[in-house]
Structures are given as C-alpha cells and as structure tokens.
Amino acid sequence: MVDMLGFISDQLDQLGVPYEFGEWTGEISYPYFVGSFNETEHRLEDGYTGGVFTLDGWSRGSKLTLAEINDKLKKAFEDLRAVQEGTAFFITYWNGLMIPTGEEDLFRITITLNTNEWKGA
C-alpha cells in the first residue's frame, strides 16, 4: 500500500495537484486535495493488491478549477502502467463526482481511481 500511495503522490505532484494523504495539514489555499485508500483485495500467492484511491478536492469561487483538474487526472490515469523498484502498478480513472457542500461558494469533487499493484514484478 505504501508503494502505491507514494507512486500516486509522485504522479499528482508531477501534474501540479496540491495534495496530501489523510488530511490537509498546511495552510488552506484553494484548490486543495486530500486522498484516502481502501484496500479491496490482497493475494499472497502472486503479490497482488487491489484497491480504490479516492481524492477529495475543494475549491472556492468556481467549480471550473475542480473540473479542469478532474479532466487532467482523467487523462493521466486513463490507463497508467508503470514498474518501479520491482513493483508493477496499473491505475485507471474511475469517475469524478461533484458533491454539494451546502455553502454557496465552496465546491467539492470526489475523484476515484482503481488501483492494482503487484510486488516482485
């Protein structure tokens, strides 16, 4: 899981997405994104771990910023395959969903990625 989270963090950094895992600890500056991970399957025999990575983003003033980042992530994670230090990653974009916040100028999006990781590749 740690390798997968590090790989995704590197990808988000390269794309210029302001991101932290678990919770935002820095000074609030919009937009910002916080990630979480849910492991859905683990197989010891072939080193496979499957999961769902969720990225929650917030923006003030405009939904467009979130939609633009969603489009950027959709393209980057459309069919991302990589091998790093003996671990293979296959990540696909699943969906992006705008979620009402109840505040007039605060906007939220949840972006979901399917993750697949094989150790010892």
Regions found by a protein language model. Give the residues of each.
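Low-complexity, acidic Ser/Thr/Pro/Gly-rich terminal tails and inter-domain linkers that flank the onset
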Residues: P31-V34
